[in-house]
Swiss-Prot record:
This is Ribosomal protein L11 methyltransferase. It catalyses: L-lysyl-[protein] + 3 S-adenosyl-L-methionine = N(6),N(6),N(6)-trimethyl-L-lysyl-[protein] + 3 S-adenosyl-L-homocysteine + 3 H(+). The keyword Cell membrane does not apply. Pfam families: PrmA. SUPFAM superfamilies: S-adenosyl-L-methionine-dependent methyltransferases (SSF53335). S-adenosyl-L-methionine binds at T145, G166, D188, N230. Its EC number is 2.1.1.-. Belongs to the methyltransferase superfamily. PrmA family. Gene3D superfamilies: Vaccinia Virus protein VP39.
């Protein structure tokens, strides 16, 4: 069904109040959007992180009389008569279908392709990972995932054990298996990620070589030849003592989910245990790799 969208611009401090006002005026959902496309990362648990200059967008049923909505909002102390706003009629679309139509096969490195499960593979002779991300993070479109996939493609993983720490959709663990790893272990705090990884592993015929664990269930003394963690800078720093013991002596470590401006602080958390390589950047993101001492 079609919808009507009303957009207000405000400060982060006032965004929650205006969100409540829109809901009281009949909005069925509210979205906060950064006016200037400023990245925001790592909100605290339970925190709604807002920007200094925030668009508050209310979605209304197509039958809503927006003149009545505007009249209600004009009585709000933060708005007043003639407040600035924008009203748009949204086209009736199958949004899930549109997303699927825009997700195309992507190549990473020399051998590896990530292909949506609903599309044909572009190269039958390549290493093809068929992916349906479901509700979990990880499609290959984000620079951090791309950096990790390119790194895995550059390695000789034949017969190796790989740990994907924060596995999301399972894209990195499954790619490692398709690239020749003997076994991969995926760890994630989200049960939905575990299920998405399991489904994608079955789709790619590697489920018998993929072990999946919530952190509370992971085996003690777990070790791997290659460890990859594409999460966020804060957790990478905080979990450095745990992540650093996962690679065997001489094993490889790959970290991403890190802004280039955060690279130095993440490196400091690992430099005592690893011989680190030069940081590799892609757009505003980066990848840190190294070999266990």
């Amino acid at each position: 069904m079609p919808w009507i969208q009303l957009k207000l611009n405000t400060t982060g401090a006032n965004a929650e109040d205006l969100s409540d006002a829109l809901m009281e005026a009949g909005a069925v959902s509210i979205t906060f959007q950064d006016t200037h496309d400023t990245p925001v990362f790592e909100p605290l648990p339970g925190e709604t992180r807002l920007w200094g200059d925030t668009d508050v967008i209310g979605l209304f049923d197509a039958e809503t009389d927006m003149n009545d909505v505007v009249a209600i909002l004009e009585n709000h102390p933060l708005l007043g008569a003639g407040f600035a706003h924008k009203i748009e009629q949204l086209e009736d679309k199958d949004w899930e279908r549109e997303w699927m139509d825009n997700f195309h096969p992507m190549r990473f490195g020399e051998r590896l392709w990530i292909c949506p499960s609903w599309r044909d593979v572009p190269d039958e002779n390549a290493v093809n990972v068929m992916l349906d991300p479901g509700l979990a993070f990880g499609t290959g479109t984000h620079p951090t995932t791309s950096l990790c996939l390119q790194w895995l493609d550059s390695l000789d993983l034949t017969g190796k054990i790989v740990i994907d720490f924060g596995c999301g959709s399972g894209i990195l663990a499954i790619a490692a298996l398709k690239l020749g790893a003997a076994k991969a272990i995926g760890i994630d705090i989200d049960p939905q990620a575990i299920q998405a990884s399991r489904d994608n592993a079955e789709r790619n015929g590697v489920s018998d070589r993929l072990e999946l664990y919530l952190p509370k269930d992971q085996p003690e003394e777990m070790k791997a030849d290659v460890v990859v963690a594409n999460i966020l800078a804060g957790p990478l720093r905080e979990l450095a003592p745990l992540i650093s013991v996962l690679p065997v002596s001489g094993g490889l470590l790959g970290l991403s989910g890190i802004l280039a401006s955060q690279a130095e602080s993440v490196c400091e958390a690992y430099v005592d245990s690893f011989a680190l390589d030069p940081v590799v950047e892609k757009e505003e993101w980066c990848r840190i790799t190294g070999r266990k001492n």
